[in-house]
Amino acid sequence: EGGIRTPLLIRWPNRIPPGVESNEMVHVTDMFTTLLSMTGCKAPADRLIDGVDQSPFFLGKQETSNRESCIVWLKDELHAVKWKDFKINFKRQQHFHDPELALGFARITHLKEDPKERDAVNQRYVRWWVMQHAQRIIRDFENSKKKEELIPPGAPRDFVPKKFAEA
């Protein structure tokens, strides 16, 4: 899955059940909200938070993750959307050092059937409904950018968004 699907190991004796394996989706941004929740703290309410609280999932209180999608951005370009068992690519890179090429159409892959993303399932009317979900995810993200600016790629460590600099 091009670096999206990577292992996550968690150990917290007497809190997190040992020996559990899962293929549920968790994003690195979820760690912030999850760790806050697990330590009894609350996420700041004055800004948008990308992560979702995964503590019920990690603690074994539920079998599914609280995340069903993530957006893959490189610098300021949308590359893909992962939704449930599907990945929708808008750019393609054959090998790690090759240039990324924009696709003329979205390339949809069912990751359980094809984890190496070799065959697209773009047959007309077969997976078109997946694009509806991808478009909703992208639209929600674009709307969030209108509410709060993104931290630009390469921003200095002391970067402060305008919203907070003016306060």
Predicted regions and their residues:
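Catalytic cores of eukaryotic secretory-pathway lumenal/extracellular enzymes that build
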Residues: R5-L9, F105
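Long, internal low-complexity/basic segments
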Residues: M31, W83-N89, Q94-H95, L101-R107, ...
